[in-house]
Every structure is written in structure tokens, then in C-alpha cells.
């Protein structure tokens, strides 16, 4: 995707692939992840998070998985139907309770903020 120029991106991070940078950020994202509608790069980043949940590599204290919230039902069910795949992967795994699809950013915020800490 488009990466706006900045000092970090041009001077330091250019030595790392986007996937490595994103994986490092997701590994530290213990309160949850909110994914807004996007295209190829956004889908790839969302599934990096889904993969961490699938293998339970994001469990915090007490083994609680942080939420991953996709915002925009129409987008994630119709435009780029990633939601059915996320639900299929979740199945009866523990991650099923950690993945959510909502319509608004406000709903996403409520989900993330209501998570037990």
C-alpha cells in the first residue's frame, strides 16, 4: 500500500519489509486491532492479525485473546468478502470470541474498551 514518506520510513525502516514491520506492530498490539475498509494491503495486514489469533500468539494475561474488529459490514461481506473466511477460520476455536464485524468506529471502540484487562 501507500506508505507516506517520513524520516523513519526513509532512514531506518526502509531496511525492513512492510510485512516484518507490520508483524512487529501486531505482536505489540495487545489491547486489540481495529481494521477499517481498505484494499490489498489492508486485507494482508488484517490476516496477519487473524493468523496470530488462529495460533493464539496474541494471548495476553490469562490467555485472553485481544479483539480484532473489522469495521464496515458491507465492505467486509460484499466488496472484499474477508469476513466469511475469518469466521470459517475461527470456527469453534478460541479466536471465535475475539473476531468481530461492526458497522461503525464507535461500535469498534466499545468492543475494544470493554475487553477485560
Language-model segments: residues:
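Glycine/proline-rich loop-helix segments at beta-alpha junctions forming the active-site rim
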Residues: 36, 53-56
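Acidic/glycine-enriched connector segments
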Residues: 1-35
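Thr-Gly-centered strand-to-loop micro-motif
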Residues: 35-37, 71
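Solvent-exposed alpha-helices and their adjacent loops that cap or buttress functional pockets
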Residues: 5-6, 18, 25-28, 56-64, ...
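Short glycine/serine/threonine-rich phosphate/pyrophosphate-binding segments
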Residues: 41-50
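C-terminal functional extensions of proteins
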Residues: 61-117
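Short gly/pro/ser/thr-enriched loop/turn and capping motifs at secondary-structure boundaries
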Residues: 1-2, 42, 75-78
